[in-house]
Amino acid sequence: TYLSYNKVVGTSLDEKLYLAFEILDYALLSAPGAPLKKALIDAGIGKDVSGSFDSGIYQPVFSIVAKNANVEQKEAFISTIEDTLRKIAEEGIDKKALRAGINYHEFRFREADFGSYPRGLMYGLQLFDSWLYDEEKPFIHMKAIPTFEFLKEQIETGYFEELIREYILDNPHGSIVIIRPEQGMTARMDKELADRLQVYKKGLSAEEIEALVKATKELEAYQEEESAPEDLAKIPVLGREDISREIAPIYNEERQTDGVKLLYHDVETNGIGYVTALFDLSEIEEELLPYAGILQSVLGIIDTEHYGYGELFNEINVHTGGIGTSLELYTDVTKVEEKEFRATFEIKGKALYPKLDVLFAMMREILMESKLGDEKRLKEILSMLKTRLQTSFLSAGHTTAVLRSLSYTSPIARFRDITSGIGFYEVVKDLEENFEERKELLIENLKKIAGRIFRKENLMLSYTSAQEGLAVLEKAVPQFADSLHTGEKESHGQCIIHCKKRNEGFRTSSKVQYVARTGNFIDGGAEYTGALQILKVILSYDYLWQNVRVKGGAYGCMSGFNRIGEGYLV
């Protein structure tokens, strides 16, 4: 069950509100330990709480959502939100949280890193947030630096507290939305549809039935009909001459700094240093790998020796562009038949060059000073993690099915499954539902993994900056590396991943079913070439699209192939 508290906030033509409510979302809800989120969790309303500000419509909506709550908690949900906000409005919002929120969003605005999405496309989409509603104001949200400066000046003035009063507490333009599951709803709706169709069919004459059959045959013929050459010629396409044969340059320079291997990437970054500390996981036993996934989820959102987890998050975002952790896999494409790979636990951060020492200090605080024995917080994180995994399985059922199927035969996929997929979810679910019986084992394993991997001899660094940023990094590395775990290292040799072939299904509340079939074409005697990427396009947009989606009426079908021989259909 989902409980949602929503308020309309002005219009998207107000550039100050456009950013101010992003900052409020951070300070009140999104940051770990944020007061409104904490109040709802402490009240037992939902296993996870999130906020959002939909600013891409003319009347933006600020929302507070509790997941896995109960319908009976509606009044408590409303009163907890409003009582907490009244108290915050009277006593004031944590000023450091506001500064952290402003810096967080300003850093990302200046950095303009949209990952794999073209920067021009993302800027163009943002223009529509205002341009759709006033043709003379396409750029108001692109000129954000003066707005950020304005918001910084308002931190001590009560401006943000007044926004809470005006647009949330005293604003009648809002809604409470409850979404609750109904067991057997899909079966009931299918039966109702079948009954309606049966009644409809009985009311048709023989001529009307014949007309339907004829129309269906005409549709099938249309679906199978080849497009006319003159119609195909109207579609703009790239020629080979339009595609460069030159690959983008790769800047990798292997160095040593204070006895630590450093992979340096000399790229102009506008004064930002991008740091990744990689810790080898190759000697962590298979049965402990799910706990490595949990450790990755815990670090950064649990108390440390010097900070509460909310204070830690704010301290990071006041001084840096953020810190995150992940588990990564690097396959050896020269040994695909042996299926060799390297797994790492990574902590990544970015900061302006003068703040790199603070970045490393915060990374050290997370890795070495986290209170992994905090039972109450661990239980909260497990509940949140379980809920988010459930949500991700529903929203990305195709990738979930492919990963699980590949894990039957691929050690690489098996690693991913037990650290982030269904295998991982099964461990998290068991720990969360049997926490009192399992908590000592959980804490022991988290501490064991941390002690074994966060060591100088287990560390490699990757760093991206212009040349002037390299000296700053080399000055900061020794103190960080020397602060890691020392002493005799417990070793169990190279981890061996065991795969087991299965045929299994998992039931969810989604109406869409996903069926995956996977295998390894290199094991079958074939080899990887770039032609397989062309085959993927042909299959996905021609054969599979026509036969599965257009003619078959299914939701869709996808395929894929990679360098290590893994292939899938889903």
Report the location of each language-model feature.
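Long, compositionally biased intrinsically disordered regions
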Residues: 149, 162-249, 390, 399, ...
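Generic solvent-exposed, charged/amphipathic alpha-helical segments
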Residues: 25, 37, 82, 157, ...
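M16 family metallopeptidases and their MPP-like homologs
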Residues: 2-10, 39-152, 172-182, 188, ...
